[in-house]
């Protein structure tokens, strides 16, 4: 009964009050893990609200973020800092940029003594650490390095055998043999099995004849082809003669080493036509070209024969029984490119967020009457733009580091389950991280106003150079479909009692949770302790993925009856893409939480917990409609999530300087006047001649 003078309480009020009491009781019984009070001193501001003042242990945070290979990164930084003539100037022409990029790569290898190719298979984490460092010098250089060592070099050592490694390793390693990776054609990119270039075996001369049958089969966008390449790994359909002289046998797409220029004179070899693809939106330090082959003959030994070979008498032999299995094995060995792009994209985001946040702390505009102007990062709108992005940068750092570790383990063990896991994870992270970074680069530019528009402050160059990350090594939309297909396969395994791969284990439990109704009591819990509980956050992410998976499986089954499997997939395509993105966000959050829990320093753990909470709640709020539609979150809880997200943005703003400093990027690496650690405006004015 309500006491006299109190308004009548509704049944909903009673229900909410009961829910809060149950929540408080459960929190007493089950303490929230990862209490982030370590290193957080509470003080009371004028309004009487608690305001957290966090003292960040910079040494510990920076050390935890560094990874194992900071030493070799510093060697890269020191080399280019000592050679200012190798720094890429603003406004450089395409021709000069290409030559400079080649000089940078040769200097790195021959002068600095850093040999990335030796780590491609032996220590992939070290290789990607070098790539991150050179990418901060010039993204074109990182891509040039990737073409030379990961694509051209990687195809030789991963698709070839000992005879190929013995013949080509040293020349690739010291850049005496600059090479190309000739897969994409004018008419076919994502559909590699649709490539039209042919490699026909001639048993009389013991040679393959490489031929471009039509304009659609011209190799297109081939890095290193326009100017510097001397060899190309050409992907072509292997065609063998049969007993019937009028017929041939198509054995599927294989890889062949094709010399394209003379080693001494550098002249284009007979039968090969090379053209320059010209100016691009970005990455103009990379010489992309187009290749046409007119019945070019190469020795039989130039077939990269790890997964299939042709004998002297034209017989085909492979340990893999079908074209599809050989094709999958071939492409599977090239997954490192996607791993590298996800990792590199996160590195680009570190540079951009560092520049934007340092400038936002420096820049002052407006303020209370008769008081000093305030930093633009003190405005809630600026915090809303940049703080969730900073949290995502940290999340991507840990998730891509884990991907690199898994990839390295896969290269050592060749464990079949791990191979499948890395393929799907690299596809999803590459697609998700590069798409997010592309949008964020524009946000950073806008957040820095007019000064963000100056080329010298790098946003334009970074945005243009990074833009293609969404397309090469697999179009992002296509890659997300691969993730969705893998999820549906795991879903089928779950209901058939099979074993799920490690990354997908959560589906077993969360699918069971999804198939029951959301708990009406927990749907109303709104305390900060509950919302910042990693279990609530991860459960919410995984519930959403399971809900999307279950519903799209039902839709596909329904539409397949009338449209067939291809038509049904296309009808549900947007749903499938949302499912894939949801799964990748779950993977990213799970790894972020694990990285926080694994941190040995209590102060740093508290700092990272704050950033992780912002990442999780911002993502939940970003898709709050989904949670509301199924009553996973009640209206009062949705409002609490929004309020807490805004507060966490404010909290992260208070340590934003320390968080970007922990990326440990020296001024000569960020190279943006507005982001200098000291005297930024002075250096900016000096740059234009004052």
UniProtKB/Swiss-Prot annotation:
GO BP annotation list: fatty acid beta-oxidation using acyl-CoA oxidase; lipid homeostasis
E.C. designation(s): 1.3.3.6
GO molecular function, one term: fatty acid binding
Keyword Lipid metabolism annotated: yes
Primary localisation category: other
InterPro entries per UniProt: ACOX_C_alpha1, Acyl-CoA_Oxase/DH_mid-dom, Acyl-CoA_Oxase/DH_mid-dom_sf, Acyl-CoA_oxidase, Acyl-CoA_oxidase_C, AcylCo_DH-like_C, AcylCoA_DH/oxidase_NM_dom_sf
Subcellular location(s) of the protein: Peroxisome; Glyoxysome
Residues of the transit peptide: 1-45
Top enzyme class: oxidoreductase
Binding site for FAD: 448-453
CC cofactor: FAD
Keywords: FAD, Fatty acid metabolism, Flavoprotein, Glyoxysome, Lipid metabolism, Oxidoreductase, Peroxisome, Transit peptide
Gene Ontology CC: glyoxysome
Function recorded in the entry: Catalyzes the desaturation of long-chain acyl-CoAs to 2-trans-enoyl-CoAs.
Protein family per UniProt: Belongs to the acyl-CoA oxidase family.
Designated name of the protein: Acyl-coenzyme A oxidase, peroxisomal
């Amino acid at each position: 009964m309500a006491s006299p003078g109190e308004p009548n309480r509704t049944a909903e009020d009673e229900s909410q009050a009961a829910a809060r009491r149950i929540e408080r009781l459960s929190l007493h019984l089950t303490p929230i893990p990862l209490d982030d009070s370590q290193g957080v001193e509470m003080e009371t501001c004028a309004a009487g609200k608690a305001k957290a003042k966090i003292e960040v242990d910079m040494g510990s945070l920076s050390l935890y973020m560094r990874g194992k290979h900071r030493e070799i990164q510093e060697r890269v930084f020191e080399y280019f800092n000592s050679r200012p003539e190798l720094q890429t100037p603003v406004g450089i022409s395409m021709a000069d940029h290409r030559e400079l990029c080649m000089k940078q790569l040769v200097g790195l290898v021959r002068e600095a003594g850093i040999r990335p190719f030796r780590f491609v298979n032996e220590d992939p984490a070290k290789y990607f650490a070098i790539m991150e460092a050179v990418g901060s010098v010039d993204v074109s250089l990182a891509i040039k390095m990737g073409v030379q060592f990961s694509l051209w070099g990687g195809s030789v050592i991963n698709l070839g055998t000992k005879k190929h490694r013995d013949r080509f390793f040293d020349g690739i390693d010291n850049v005496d043999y600059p090479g190309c990776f000739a897969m994409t054609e004018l008419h076919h990119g994502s559909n590699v099995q649709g490539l039209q270039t042919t490699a026909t075996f001639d048993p009389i001369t013991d040679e393959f004849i490489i031929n471009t049958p039509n304009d659609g089969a011209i190799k297109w966008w081939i890095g290193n082809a326009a100017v510097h390449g001397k060899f190309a790994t050409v992907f072509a359909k292997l065609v063998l003669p049969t007993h019937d002289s009028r017929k041939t046998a198509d054995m599927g797409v294989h890889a062949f080493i094709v010399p394209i220029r003379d080693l001494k004179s550098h002249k284009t070899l007979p039968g090969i036509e090379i053209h320059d693809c010209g100016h691009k939106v970005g990455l103009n330090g990379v010489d992309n070209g187009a290749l046409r082959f007119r019945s070019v003959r190469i020795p039989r030994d130039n077939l990269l024969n790890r997964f299939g070979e042709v004998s002297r008498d034209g017989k085909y032999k492979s340990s893999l029984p079908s074209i599809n299995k050989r094709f999958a094995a071939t492409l599977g060995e090239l997954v490192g490119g996607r791993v590298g792009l996800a990792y590199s994209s996160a590195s680009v985001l570190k540079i951009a967020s560092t520049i934007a946040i340092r400038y936002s702390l420096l820049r002052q505009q407006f303020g209370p009457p008769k008081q000093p102007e305030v930093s633009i990062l003190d405005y809630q709108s600026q915090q809303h733009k940049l703080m969730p992005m900073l949290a995502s940068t940290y999340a991507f750092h840990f998730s891509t580091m884990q991907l690199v570790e898994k990839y390295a383990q896969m290269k050592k063990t060749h464990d079949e389950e791990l191979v499948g896991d890395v393929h799907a994870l690299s596809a999803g992270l590459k697609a998700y991280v590069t798409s997010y970074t592309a949008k964020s680069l524009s946000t950073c530019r806008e957040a820095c106003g007019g000064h963000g528009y100056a080329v010298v402050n790098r946003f334009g160059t970074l945005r243009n150079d990074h833009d293609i990350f969404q397309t090469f090594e697999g179009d992002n939309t296509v890659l997300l479909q691969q993730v969705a297909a893998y999820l549906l396969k795991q879903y089928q395994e779950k209901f058939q009692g099979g074993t799920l791969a490690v990354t997908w284990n959560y589906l077993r439990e969360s699918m069971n949770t999804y198939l029951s109704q959301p708990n009406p009591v927990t749907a109303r819990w709104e305390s900060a302790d509950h919302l910042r509980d990693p279990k609530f956050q991860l459960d919410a992410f995984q519930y959403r993925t399971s809900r999307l998976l279950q519903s799209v499986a039902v839709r596909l089954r329904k539409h397949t009856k009338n449209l067939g499997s291809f038509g049904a997939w296309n009808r549900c395509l947007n749903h499938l893409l949302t499912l894939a993105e949801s799964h990748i966000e779950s993977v990213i959050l799970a790894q972020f939480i694990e990285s926080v829990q694994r941190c040995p320093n209590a102060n740093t753990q508290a700092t990272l917990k704050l950033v992780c909470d912002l990442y999780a709640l911002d993502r939940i709020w970003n898709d709050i409609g989904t949670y509301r539609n199924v009553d996973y979150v009640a209206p009062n809880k949705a409002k609490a999530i929004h309020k807490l997200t805004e507060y966490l943005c404010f909290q992260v703003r208070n340590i934003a300087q320390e968080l970007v400093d922990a990326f440990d990027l020296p001024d000569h690496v960020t190279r943006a006047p507005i982001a200098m650690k000291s005297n930024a405006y002075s250096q900016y004015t000096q740059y234009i001649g004052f």
